[in-house]
Swiss-Prot record:
Inhibits cell division during the SOS response. Affects a later stage of the cell division protein assembly, after the assembly of the Z ring, by probably suppressing recruitment of FtsL and/or DivIC to the division machinery. Belongs to the YneA family. It comes from Listeria monocytogenes serotype 4b (strain CLIP80459). This is Cell division suppressor protein YneA. Its main location: cytoplasm. It holds the Pfam family LysM. GO terms for cellular component: cytoplasm.
Amino acid sequence: MTMKLIWDKFYVSIIFVLTCIILGIILMCTVVGGGNDYSEVNVSEGDSLWALADQYAGKSDMAKADFVSWVEKENNLADGHVEAGDSVVIPVHKTKLIKSDSTIQLANQ
């Protein structure tokens, strides 16, 4: 079969398969690129994972133990030890952290 005969006979199938491949690639790029919705916090002097859990676990809808386990796993902290100046990703969506930390100041008249 020549290319012309293959195209004439299977053009709908070829277009369908190519469309599926292109949409699949777009979907994979979108999902992989959009996975970083969690907040990153800087560890202060004297902070521990449990202190971060006390501060942020309520905003993540997780129990404190689950919060600490998640942070250890996602930040590759085998011993759970963090030092001042470290940045860790926490399971609190960026929008929740911004909303709760922001304040509104009214202008004086």
